[in-house]
């Protein structure tokens, strides 16, 4: 499927779980080949994957989705070392190697109170939720190329936020 897509000489190649069903050796070979072709032909590539080890290896920027909503977008290295959105923290805590976890400041508390009704899509599971989260979905806040959709980063919250949470 990847070879057929490349025959069309696209400007953008979308790879949705493109190597997830391959064994480790074949997967490495296909990824190496794909990354080389993408670089040589100057094709933009969008990888969609649940595999954070893969994302760390191949991506320059990463976007994290929660229930179809963009929760956070940043340079991959920055996002893995210092995630801002509570869901990104939980996601990475579940899959990151111990050396990266040690470098991180703190783990996020997780609560499970069922699904959210309006407001923030992560409200029912967030350990940092506030009253405003229940009623209003957060905007996407942009900080010099890094974006996060969380009320913790609204102007009124930034001034008084817990210094241990970034």
Language-model region placement:
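Generic detector of short, locally flexible boundary/turn motifs and exposed helical patches
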Residues: 12, 27-29, 113-119
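Generic detector of low-complexity/intrinsically disordered segments
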Residues: 14-15, 154
């Amino acid at each position: 499927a990847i070879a057929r897509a490349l025959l069309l000489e696209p400007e953008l190649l979308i790879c949705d779980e493109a190597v997830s069903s391959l064994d480790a050796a074949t997967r490495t070979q296909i990824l190496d080949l794909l990354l080389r072709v993408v670089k040589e032909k100057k094709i933009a590539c969008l990888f969609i994957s649940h595999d954070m080890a893969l994302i760390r290896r191949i991506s320059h920027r990463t976007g994290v989705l929660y229930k179809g909503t963009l929760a956070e977008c940043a340079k991959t290295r920055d996002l893995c070392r210092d995630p801002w959105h509570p869901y990104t923290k939980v996601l990475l805590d579940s899959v990151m190697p111990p050396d990266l976890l040690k470098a991180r400041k703190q783990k996020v508390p997780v609560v499970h109170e069922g699904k959210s009704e309006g407001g923030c899509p992560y409200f029912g599971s967030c350990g940092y939720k506030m009253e405003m989260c229940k009623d209003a979905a957060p905007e996407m806040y942009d900080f010099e190329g890094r974006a996060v959709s969380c009320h913790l980063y609204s102007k009124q919250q930034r001034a008084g936020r817990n210094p241990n949470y970034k």
